[in-house]
Every structure is written in structure tokens, then in C-alpha cells.
């Protein structure tokens, strides 16, 4: 058997403050370690470089960092092809550097989660090398092997651009191995109890070091069963319950976030039993919502958003959705109809180079043609719709992309800190940087960077920071009930978020969003709140009191309002 490092071999980080439901009110920020800051001049971002930028992340208002894989890897799939679950990729640093990052983050009240790729490993992982060379050895059954490639024929191929089958022949073992993703990423065999125990030990290793949780990558595909599509199988949920029990019993306060690109009715199963408040994952991404936000604004109609939220089941009390606009992958269009996918390609990916797999490899600002009003509207929706928002590094300053780079590298370029050499990312020769910094006239680092925007009160960065600050002042955004209000104008999306405070008082937030590029009026039935006063949250301006008649608002093109609805007692407490 292989000898694995243990957490006791390393110093562990200080724990974050105890708060079992911290994730419900958190603002998440996805950072690619490679892309954030290079501390040693080798052209690649690293853990020490990321630690040096924690003051900025704290200033922005971020509660939790999400780090995609930083493990040892041959890097054929951006680190999702892991060759050692207990080692850090040398160019990123060491396990000790990761513990230092955790310590520094926790000292600032920032939590850290990372991806754990449960479904597969790299084909260079020692487990796979042992499995292929010694079928009767201890690792012989760690992967899914077959004498032919006819099994599980109903399972779809995910990477249709590059893969023609989910089976690949291995000449060393003389059998086919199963892979739901790339051929160099063989799937682990979760029918083998030893595999389950090995992955639970990986979970414990990083939790012992102090990490605050995991985004569980590609969870729907852990098990296979003939005659099914090999997704969302009951055995998968059984294993996730085991993971959750380990967390609850041994590491309370840590979080499991499911990455399941499925319909809401399927994803809700990953929260587990509602009677227990949820006994699988604490959080899950709401993938189908994201493309429908883009569709709704381009069609100037609230119905794409309204319909998907209406199809979203209630989730257990202890759980929360994760919502996002962009991340390190393509803007995935798996969870839309063929007609909707064609529409999205026509509107947002006019150049064929902008497409990747079943999606669009562009950043937020270029998708929205660098329109400040749209950027603000999209961010306001992200921060106010049900769920914990996940920002993608650089979107807070409106960073661009580079569609001339291969695959998803288009949206993974270095963070733009200053207008200086290499955008302040690295002091190395520009030719050594892992990817070139953006240098075009609109999105280039000379024009778009943190330094310039921090000094400008009206910048997108300072506006985003202010909106995060406002969100945190009203817990209704985090845990409030969501009620869509309809209204007289289909171009306007209006909803209430209502939260009952511990003292029994209500925190009611009204959000009104104009999805049209033109000014729009709307009449809302707010008679339930007759006598209440809407207080606009970004400027503190009071609007006319609500009466029994429909409440009339006029919004500028792509404009929005956030109001707190104040009753007589609330106004009295404000001294009015």
C-alpha cells in the first residue's frame, strides 16, 4: 500500500469563529491561485501571493474565498486532474504555505473553501498507475474497468468537443476504463468500500488542517448503474450522507457545497432529508438560474427568471443556494433548451471562438459589452436573489477576457492590480507569465485595474463594495423569504425578501429591477404594506408612503431600486 501524508505531519491553522450557519449570509469570492498574485517572480500566482492580497479581499467585503484545485497535478484540466490529493502543486507553494494562508484569512474573519474532486483522478495518480499495472493488487479495483466499451450506454458524453466515448482502452491493463470527463481523468470506483474510505480520509486531511469546507466537484457522477444515465443515483446520495456525517460529527461549522449542474428538482436532492434540516450538502449551486438572467435582460422580460424560480423547490431550513454570474468555466448552457441555447449563442457568442463545450467562454463585462448600467443591474440581481452570491475575481473591476487563448483560459488571465509592469501581478519578465495579461484598449490593465478604481469614488469597484456593504446590513437578503410581486410591466422584475428578526420584528426589502434598456414604469400591488414608507437603501432617500392603490415607480434603463419598507415603529426608531 502507498504511504500517504497525514495532517499531523503539518501545523494546523487557527479556526474561524464558531457560527454553524455562516454560509447563509456569506459573500463568496472565487480566486484562481495561479491568477491572483505571484510572490516569487516565476510568472505564476501562488499561495503566498494570495495571502498578500487578503487585505484587499477583506476591504471588498468578502466572507469566504473559494479556491479551485491547488493540488499536485499535471495540469491537463486546470488542476481538476489531481495526481496527489494531499500535496500542493509545487509552483503554488507547499502545504505549510496553505496553512499560512488559512491562518491569515481566519485572522481577518475570512473563511476558505476549496474544490475536492470526488469523481476522478489524473491518470498519473499513483492509485491509477498501481491499478493498471497490478489488477489483483490493493488498487486493482480503485477504478471502473471493463473488457469492452458497451456498458452504461445511456450515459451522455459531457465534453462533446473532445471526447467520443466515456470509455478508453488502456494497453497496460488490456481493459477499458470509465471516465465521465476527459480520457486522462479516470473515474474512481465508489462501489469499492476502500475508495470511499480513502476519499473520506482526504476530506479529513484538509479539515484537520483548518479548511472551512469543500465545493464537491462533479458529484452527480460518482456511481454507475446499467440502464440509467449514471447521474444522481441513490448510491451517490448515500455516500454524500457519509461525508456530511463526518463533517457534522468531527468538524462542526464546516460546509459542503455541491457542484451539480442539474435541474433544480434534481439538485434539491443533494441537500438531503428536509426533516433533518438537510443531511447531505449545506449548499448547492443553482446552475439553471444563471443563463436565464442573461436571457431575461437581453429579451427585456422577467419571465425567464420568474419561471426558473417558480420551478425551484423549497430547500431544507439548514441549506442555501449558491448563485453566480460567471466563474472559471464557460458560461454553461446545459440547463437550457436547444432553442434557448441557440438564442444565447446568437446574442452573446457571435464569434465562434467565444464558444467552448456547451457554453460561452467570456467574462461578465465583455458579455455585457462593458455597459456600466448592465453590470450594475446584473450585480444587483446577484446580490439580492435567493442564495449566497459568488463573485469571480476581477469582475468587480470589469476585467476582460482573451478569446485567442485556448479552451477556458480565456477567462483565467492574471488579476489586474495596477497600470504598471505585468499589471502588478508579477515582477518577472512578461514572457514568463503563465498567461498574458489583458492588453487591449478597452479592457487592458492600463485602463482596468484595482489601483485606479480604488482611487475613484464612482468606479465599478467602489460601487460593488458599497452594494456588498448594503447587503450585509439587511439579513433579509441572506435568509429572507422570496415573493415575486408580478406587476403591470413584464420588463420589470420585482420581489420582496422578508426576514423575521430574533426580536420578532420584520426586515422587509423590496427589489425592483428594470430588465429593459429603456425607461419603464411599473405599478405594484403593495397594499399589504399600507402606511409603510419605502427607504431607498443606497442613498437613504425616503419615497412616498404606500397606500391602498397600486404603487407607481419609474425606473431608468437597466435601473433598479432596493428599498427597506419601514412601518410606523421603524420610522419612530429612526427618530422621524
What is the predicted role of each segment?
Residues 1-576:
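Active-site and adjacent substrate-binding regions of carbohydrate-active enzymes
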Amino acid at each position: 500500500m502507498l504511504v500517504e501524508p497525514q495532517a499531523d505531519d503539518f501545523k494546523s491553522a487557527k479556526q474561524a469563529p464558531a457560527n454553524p450557519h455562516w454560509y447563509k449570509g456569506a459573500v463568496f469570492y472565487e480566486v484562481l491561485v495561479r491568477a491572483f498574485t505571484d510572490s516569487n517572480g516565476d510568472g505564476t500566482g501562488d499561495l503566498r501571493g494570495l495571502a498578500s492580497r487578503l487585505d484587499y479581499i477583506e476591504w471588498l467585503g468578502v466572507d469566504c474565498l473559494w479556491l479551485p484545485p491547488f493540488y499536485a497535478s499535471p495540469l491537463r484540466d486546470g488542476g481538476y486532474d489531481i495526481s496527489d490529493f494531499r500535496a500542493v502543486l509545487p509552483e503554488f507553494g507547499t502545504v505549510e504555505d496553505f496553512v499560512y494562508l488559512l491562518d491569515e484569512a481566519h485572522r481577518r474573519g475570512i473563511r476558505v473553501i476549496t474544490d475536492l474532486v470526488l469523481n476522478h483522478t489524473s491518470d498519473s495518480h499513483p492509485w491509477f498507475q498501481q491499478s493498471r499495472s497490478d489488477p489483483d493488487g490493493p488498487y486493482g479495483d480503485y477504478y471502473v474497468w471493463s473488457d469492452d466499451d458497451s456498458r452504461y450506454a445511456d450515459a451522455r458524453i459531457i465534453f462533446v468537443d473532445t471526447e467520443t466515448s466515456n470509455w478508453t482502452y488502456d494497453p497496460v491493463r488490456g481493459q477499458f476504463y470509465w471516465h465521465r470527463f476527459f480520457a486522462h481523468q479516470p473515474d474512481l470506483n465508489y462501489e469499492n468500500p476502500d475508495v470511499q474510505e480513502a476519499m473520506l480520509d482526504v476530506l479529513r486531511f484538509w479539515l484537520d488542517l483548518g479548511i472551512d469546507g469543500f465545493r464537491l466537484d462533479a458529484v452527480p457522477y460518482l456511481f454507475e448503474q446499467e440502464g440509467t444515465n449514471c447521474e444522481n443515483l441513490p448510491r451517490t446520495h448515500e455516500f454524500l450522507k457519509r461525508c456530511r456525517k463526518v463533517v457534522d460529527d468531527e468538524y462542526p461549522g464546516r460546509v459542503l457545497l455541491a457542484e451539480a449542474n442539474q435541474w433544480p428538482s434534481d439538485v434539491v436532492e443533494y441537500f438531503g432529508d428536509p426533516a433533518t434540516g438537510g443531511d447531505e450538502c449545506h449548499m448547492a449551486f443553482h446552475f439553471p438560474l444563471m443563463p436565464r438572467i442573461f436571457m431575461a435582460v437581453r429579451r427585456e422580460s422577467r419571465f425567464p427568471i420568474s419561471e426558473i424560480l417558480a420551478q425551484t423547490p423549497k430547500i431544507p431550513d439548514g441549506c442555501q443556494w449558491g448563485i453566480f454570474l460567471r466563474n472559471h468555466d464557460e458560461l454553461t448552457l446545459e440547463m437550457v433548451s436547444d432553442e434557448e441555447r441557440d438564442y444565447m449563442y446568437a446574442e452573446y457568442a457571435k464569434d465562434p471562438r467565444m464558444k467552448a463545450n456547451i457554453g460561452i467562454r467570456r467574462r461578465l463585462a465583455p458579455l455585457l459589452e462593458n455597459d456600466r448600467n448592465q453590470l450594475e443591474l446584473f450585480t444587483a440581481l446577484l446580490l439580492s436573489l435567493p442564495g449566497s452570491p459568488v463573485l469571480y475575481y476581477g469582475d468587480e473591476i470589469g476585467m476582460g477576457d482573451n478569446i485567442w487563448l485556448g479552451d477556458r483560459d480565456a477567462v483565467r488571465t492574471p488579476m489586474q492590480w495596477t497600470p504598471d509592469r505585468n499589471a502588478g501581478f508579477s515582477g518577472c519578465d512578461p514572457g514568463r507569465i503563465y498567461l498574458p495579461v489583458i492588453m487591449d484598449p478597452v479592457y487592458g490593465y492600463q485602463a482596468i485595474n484595482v489601483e485606479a478604481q480604488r482611487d475613484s469614488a464612482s468606479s465599478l469597484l467602489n460601487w460593488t463594495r458599497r452594494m456588498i456593504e448594503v447587503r450585509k446590513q439587511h439579513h433579509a437578503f441572506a435568509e429572507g423569504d422570496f415573493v415575486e410581486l408580478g406587476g403591470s410591466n413584464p420588463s420589470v422584475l420585482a420581489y420582496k425578501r422578508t426576514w423575521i428578526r430574533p426580536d420578532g420584528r420584520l426586515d422587509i426589502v423590496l427589489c425592483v429591477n428594470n430588465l429593459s434598456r429603456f425607461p419603464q414604469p411599473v405599478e405594484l400591488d403593495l397594499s399589504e404594506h399600507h402606511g409603510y414608507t419605502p427607504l431607498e437603501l443606497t442613498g437613504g432617500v425616503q419615497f412616498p408612503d404606500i397606500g391602498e392603490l397600486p404603487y407607481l415607480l419609474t425606473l431608468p434603463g437597466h435601473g433598479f431600486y432596493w428599498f427597506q419598507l419601514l412601518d410606523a415603529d421603524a420610522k419612530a426608531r429612526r427618530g422621524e
